[in-house]
Amino acid sequence: MTNQNDNFLVLKNINKTFGKSVVIDDLDLVIKRGTMVTLLGPSGCGKTTILRLVAGLENPTSGQIFIDGEDVTKSSIQNRDICIVFQSYALFPHMSIGDNVGYGLRMQNIAKEERKQRIREALELVDLAGFEDRFVDQISGGQQQRVALARALVLKPKVLLFDEPLSNLDANLRRSMREKIRELQQSLSITSLYVTHDQTEAFAVSDEVIVMNKGKIVQKAPAKELYQQPNSLFLANFMGESSIFNGQLQGNQVTLNGYQFTLPNAQQFNLPNGDCLVGIRPEAVTLKETGEPSQQCSIKTAVYMGNHWEIVADWAGQDLLINANPEVFNPEQKQAYVHLSSHGVFLLKKE
């Protein structure tokens, strides 16, 4: 039985309007104690507004916000025991790294010796031990982001908020930083809310991902479930690439374009027999030299991407996206036969 106290960060019936524009529309959200949840969605979906409401940087038009059972809806950011890691780092260039990390402790009038110890511990957590006396212009962008993270961790907040913290880093630094963030969040069990527009980042750091659109939650689930079982056409198109076909379902048999195949997990999509939409991820398709006439397709384009060929094929008059093994696919071939793996195929209600 789930303990009600595990519901650590709770938003109830939250609405937020700016003038006549509805930004958040009657939203409910629960984040369990010690978990990391990411808000993901297109620009303007409301994810950053939610983070600002939780932080106390904006007030909801209506609704309530609870942290660890306490109603903080009208509390200032100083009284919410929250820290934010920003995209811009927001470090003071005239201060040493140690003074940057310890700035919040100083504002809380923490004794000097305790400050020094906590600064040292926080820098060790982010692999910057011994950096206390350096200055911002003496360290790299990735190190600056770790200083910003240490500055938040040193305060031991109840809730840690991340506002697109890795957007200014290159691809390799983003990868290492998201690994570090996830490692620290899990080891310290800090309840965390993360905002990003990057699907890979969201999947890498989160216990659960919330996809938003037009101020509402579309689906909240672990990353694997979102990808393999999207609950709407919007989500299917937003979470990675897919090709959507009209099909028919009968038990665990799926038919599309005259091609019938077995989908062992068909029941998990909770659809009745009959017409449906069939979503096919690019990795679910294998091209072979033989098959039934209903499986034949024409290769329209093939682009070499290093670890795979990115192919667009014409299958019964509709585009089919395919990721093909570079050791198997011949870029000179113009015709092939579609074979589907059940992994990477999902079903949706026909709208």
Curated annotation (Swiss-Prot):
The keyword Transmembrane helix does not apply. It comes from the Bacteria. It is found in: Cell inner membrane. One of its GO terms (cellular component) is ATP-binding cassette (ABC) transporter complex. InterPro entries: AAA+_ATPase, ABC_SmlMolc_Importer, ABC_transporter-like_ATP-bd, ABC_transporter-like_CS, ABC_transpr_FbpC, Mo/tungstate-bd_C_term_dom, P-loop_NTPase, Transp-assoc_OB_typ2. ATP binds at G41, P42, S43, G44, C45, G46, K47, T48. It is a peripheral membrane protein. Gene3D superfamilies: 2.40.50.100, P-loop containing nucleotide triphosphate hydrolases. GO terms for molecular function: ABC-type ferric iron transporter activity; ATP binding; ATP hydrolysis activity. Residues 9-239 form the ABC transporter domain. Pfam families: ABC_tran, TOBE_2. PROSITE patterns: ABC_TRANSPORTER_1 (PS00211), ABC_TRANSPORTER_2 (PS50893), FBPC (PS51242). It catalyses: Fe(3+)(out) + ATP + H2O = Fe(3+)(in) + ADP + phosphate + H(+). Its EC number is 7.2.2.7. Belongs to the ABC transporter superfamily. Fe(3+) ion importer (TC 3.A.1.10) family. Part of the ABC transporter complex FbpABC involved in Fe(3+) ions import. Responsible for energy coupling to the transport system. The complex is composed of two ATP-binding proteins (FbpC), two transmembrane proteins (FbpB) and a solute-binding protein (FbpA). This is Fe(3+) ions import ATP-binding protein FbpC.
